């Protein structure tokens, strides 16, 4: 890792595999479904207040469930800024769920937000924003591309 750092490649190791999986889930769960339903690229999350509010609620619910699972995703309080930095870097990208909805293909909603809903139920915790988006994406999927 040191040699890579000397040439400008900076890597870090995740504390655990479970932490890395939850971190990826936080990224996907907080942005894929709202952008898919809106049919917009990643940057819209930072440009449109309503989408940004949804992003924050989804992120907070995901962090809560990860914590219930024994994983502290945001020990230094910087998770939101780190994800927003990634959003800025990929602002023009259309996520896979948005592409799937637009093309009438199955989405990964049950494996992303649906998984958070299931883990929340296991812990007796309500995640209304995740549940709302699971329902909305499923409903949109039934009606095909718009």
Each PLM stretch: what is its role?
Residues 1-75:
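Internal alpha-helical scaffold of NAD(P)-dependent oxidoreductase catalytic cores
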Residues 5, 53-146:
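NAD(P)-dependent Rossmann-like dehydrogenase/reductase catalytic/cofactor-binding core
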């Amino acid at each position: 890792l040191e040699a890579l750092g000397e040439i400008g490649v900076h890597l870090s190791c995740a504390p655990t595999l479970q932490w890395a999986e939850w971190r990826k889930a936080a990224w996907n769960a907080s942005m894929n479904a709202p952008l898919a339903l809106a049919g917009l690229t990643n940057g819209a999350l930072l440009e449109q207040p309503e989408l940004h509010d949804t992003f924050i609620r989804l992120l907070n619910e995901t962090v809560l469930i990860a914590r219930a699972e024994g994983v502290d995703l945001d020990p230094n309080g910087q998770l939101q800024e780190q994800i927003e930095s990634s959003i800025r870097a990929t602002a023009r990208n259309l996520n896979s769920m948005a592409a799937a909805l637009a093309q009438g293909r199955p989405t990964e909603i049950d494996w992303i937000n649906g998984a958070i809903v299931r883990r929340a139920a296991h812990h007796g915790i309500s995640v209304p924003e995740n549940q709302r988006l699971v329902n909305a994406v499923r409903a949109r999927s039934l009606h095909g591309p718009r």
